[in-house]
Amino acid sequence: MDLKVTLIKSVAHRLPKQRKIVKALGLGKVNSTVVLPDNAATRGALLKIAHLISVEEVNK
């Protein structure tokens, strides 16, 4: 099981830590999407920026 993550809000005017998390996950501009593995590290990062993203579960 993987997670499809889409950035739905801009990182402008956000805390630097939140901007770094978005960049580390491979997200760039609004509406950019990445597929990430479903593990504890990924879920922890997603919780920190939950207000900026949408997450869907996808099968491999």
UniProtKB/Swiss-Prot annotation:
CDD domains: Ribosomal_L30. GO terms for biological process: translation. Transmembrane segments: none annotated. Keywords: Ribonucleoprotein, Ribosomal protein. The keyword Ribonucleoprotein applies. The keyword Isomerase does not apply. GO terms for cellular component: cytosolic large ribosomal subunit. GO terms for molecular function: structural constituent of ribosome. It holds the Pfam family Ribosomal_L30. Part of the 50S ribosomal subunit. Belongs to the universal ribosomal protein uL30 family. This is Large ribosomal subunit protein uL30.
